[in-house]
């Protein structure tokens, strides 16, 4: 079983406190089940990025499985790693989709728990799904240490192939923050430049803009994998539903950027 590594740090450890924190994140939002195929959500502490993430989660439909692509911040494990463990959070256990995982055997995506053991980027998304959908769903966590364009596209294509073979209803979630520790004005300018390419679903342009402006988004590979998989499964439209920064909460001059984007 994969035990939570950032409960009590990024989000509350107790069930009651966690539910209260997530309710705050959804304050003022209407929970709508739309025909969303993919999403981009941030992965900082809930007090900072939770309300932004909630804007995307509020639009997600109930699915059989949520494939969650996250960047590897720790450097541990395989370059592209899926988990097949049961994932525990303060809300309880969530099963991984082992059937979908088997369809990815022998691909660029390794089955490796080490990459996930101390990584927070996937973990922080699961309580949001539990809050909305209870325990009647599965997840397929994919941790990406390799985020180059060719790798990310291949990951997305392989996942889309497996999903089509499975016949399941699947939503793809990319976990990523945007600019890191830059002035508010620079974050907004750089992030919107990158977001425009994401909204256009233009993968080469995402990479070009990231490197042109040295934008420190940590999950550009997961975003690319999500967009690739979503497009392969019929997605044609995107929407930026919320943008914000850590400075909106802290008032600090150096901020981290967050975006909630949905793909339909």
From Swiss-Prot:
Q: Under what name is this protein listed?
A: MEMO1 family protein Mbur_2394
> What NCBIfam families is this protein classified in?
AmmeMemoSam_B (TIGR04336), PRK00782.1 (NF001987)
Q: Which organism is it from?
A: Methanococcoides burtonii (strain DSM 6242 / NBRC 107633 / OCM 468 / ACE-M)
Q: Which family does it belong to?
A: Belongs to the MEMO1 family.
């Amino acid at each position: 079983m994969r035990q939570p590594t950032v409960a009590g740090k990024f989000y509350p450890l107790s069930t009651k406190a966690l539910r209260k924190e997530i309710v705050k994140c959804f304050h003022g939002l209407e929970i709508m089940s739309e025909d969303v195929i993919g999403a981009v959500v941030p992965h900082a502490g809930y007090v900072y990025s939770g309300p932004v993430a909630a804007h995307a989660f509020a639009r997600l439909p109930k699915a059989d499985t949520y494939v969650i692509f996250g960047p590897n911040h720790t450097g541990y494990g395989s370059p592209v790693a899926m988990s097949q463990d049961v994932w525990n959070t303060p809300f309880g256990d969530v099963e991984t989709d082992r059937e979908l995982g088997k369809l990815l055997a022998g691909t660029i995506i390794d089955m490796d728990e080490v990459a996930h053991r101390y990584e927070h980027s996937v973990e922080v998304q699961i309580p949001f799904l539990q809050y909305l959908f209870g325990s009647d769903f599965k997840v397929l966590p994919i941790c990406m240490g390799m985020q180059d364009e060719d790798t990310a596209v291949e990951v997305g294509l392989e996942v889309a192939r497996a999903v089509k073979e499975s016949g399941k209803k699947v939503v793809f979630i990319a976990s990523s923050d945007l600019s890191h520790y830059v002035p508010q004005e620079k974050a907004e300018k750089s992030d919107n430049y990158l977001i425009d390419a994401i909204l256009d679903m233009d993968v080469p342009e995402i990479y070009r803009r990231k490197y042109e402006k040295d934008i420190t988004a940590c999950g550009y590979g997961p975003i690319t994998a999500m967009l690739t998989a979503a497009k392969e499964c019929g997605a044609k439209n995107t929407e930026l539903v919320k943008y914000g920064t850590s400075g909106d909460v802290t008032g600090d001059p150096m901020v981290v950027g967050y975006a909630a984007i949905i793909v339909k």
